[in-house]
Design a protein with these regions (language model features):
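Mid-bilayer segments of alpha-helical transmembrane spans in multi-pass integral membrane proteins
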Residues: 129-140, 168-180, 211
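Membrane-interface alpha-helices at helix entry/exit sites of multi-pass transporters
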Residues: 119-123, 138-143, 151-169, 326-337
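Re-entrant/interfacial helical elements at transmembrane boundaries that shape
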Residues: 139-151, 181, 305-323, 352
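Hydrophobic alpha-helical membrane segments of integral membrane proteins
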Residues: 134, 145-149, 161-169, 174-176, ...
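Predominantly cytoplasmic-facing regulatory/coupling regions of multi-pass membrane proteins
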Residues: 2-126, 185, 190-302, 333, ...
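Short helix-loop-helix connector
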Residues: 112-113, 151-155, 281-282, 322-326
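Transmembrane alpha-helix interface/packing and boundary motifs in multi-pass membrane proteins
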Residues: 127-137, 294-314
Length: 361
């Protein structure tokens, strides 16, 4: 598929300009409108239910195994004694992650000449988190819901996909930065082992795969091995749609620096939420220990067999925290509080917001 040529490297994409007009607007918009609802079909729901059952079993297994090596009474006391003030601060910090995510979209849309207010984008971000958790698809389902929401707010389909591409690439860059930084810290602390090195290597391959497939499709179309890679990723329809997205936004160093910085802030806010959860229970490890443990746990959840990360995240988080000197009971209590703030709590508004977006458009 061909990409519209951009006449200026610095001029924003205007709705009426040739550069911003897709060559196949109707096809592009129709494809996008049908991709997101399709993710809510019966097959997807059955697959999601299977993922949830496996994830919950793994989650309970992790708790039982951890409690076998620790004290159930001590962990229960830590959770019961959690100070609400610290949890409220943690909730406020966690809310900043949604604002940062919305700013990523806002900056990309502003650069493309289709600005939207932040108050419109923040609810979309919450709906995305909920959709990604309920319909595990490596972030694709939630992203397509946001794209559909942007199109419903009169953002051209091509521009919405371009903004999504910026968000995806900036997220991958930021994720690679924090994982490699965490691995470096563990290396200097003499805590790296073969399993961690293998995990980091797999993560790098997986993280680079989707952007490589997208950019490869734009450059070489359906030639092998790009066609094979897109089929292996299981998101061929989305990748085909992405080939119509302008890449000029990705060639803006300023925009990339801004969006990568915002994505890095999200990781920092998430790790800070975990650190504040430890403050709530009264056992506070060093901030670097919390950050490294959170990032490695997120990495393992990303490359693990369960898309929602239930069980794999908790096991790795507790394991890393224990490896770095935190008691097993405190590690599990802090991790469970974090999951409550970042995983379970957003589902409450997420259900309503996601349904509203689907019914609205």
């Amino acid at each position: 598929m061909s990409t519209p040529q951009i006449r200026s490297a610095h001029a924003p994409l205007r709705p009426g300009s040739d550069a911003s007009r897709p060559k196949r607007t109707a096809a592009t918009e129709t494809g996008l409108v049908h991709v997101a609802p399709g993710l809510l079909g019966k097959t997807s729901r059955l697959r999601s239910l299977m993922f949830w059952i496996v994830g919950l079993v793994g989650f309970l297994a992790v708790i039982l195994v951890v409690l076998h090596f620790g004290s159930l009474q001590k962990m229960a006391e830590l959770v019961r004694s959690a100070r609400p003030g610290w949890l409220l601060v943690a909730l406020a910090v966690q809310s900043a992650t949604y604002i940062s995510a919305a700013f990523v979209w806002r900056e990309a849309l502003h650069r493309a000449g289709h600005p939207l207010p932040l108050r419109t984008l923040v609810p979309l971000g919450i709906a995305k988190v909920f959709t990604d958790q309920v319909l595990p698809s490596g972030g694709i389902s939630g992203t397509m819901l946001v794209v559909r929401g942007l199109i419903g707010r009169r953002v051209p389909a091509e521009i919405a996909m371009a903004a999504m591409l910026v968000g995806m690439v900036s997220y991958d860059i930021a994720y690679l930065i924090v994982v490699l930084a965490s691995a470096s810290v563990l290396w200097f602390q003499h805590r790296m082992n073969v399993a961690l090195i293998a995990g980091v290597a797999i993560f790098v391959v997986v993280t680079v795969a989707v952007p490589a497939a997208v950019l490869g499709l734009k450059q070489w179309g359906t030639r092998a091995p790009i066609a094979w890679l897109s089929r292996w990723l299981g998101v061929t329809t989305l990748l085909q749609e992405l080939t119509d997205a302008p890449t000029r936004l990705l060639r803006s160093p300023r925009l990339l620096m801004q969006t990568v910085g915002l994505q890095l802030a999200i990781f920092v806010f998430d790790a800070l939420t975990l650190w504040l959860a430890f403050n709530a229970i009264g056992e506070v490890p060093p901030l670097w220990v919390v950050f490294v443990s959170f990032i490695i746990a997120s990495m393992v959840a990303t490359i693990g067999p369960i898309p929602v990360g239930l069980g794999t995240f908790e096991a790795t988080s507790v394991g890393m925290l224990s490896l770095l000197g935190v008691s097993v009971e405190a590690a599990l209590a802090g991790t469970l509080l974090l999951r409550g703030l970042t995983f379970w709590l957003p589902m409450l508004p997420g259900v309503w917001l996601a349904r509203r977006e689907i019914q609205r458009h």
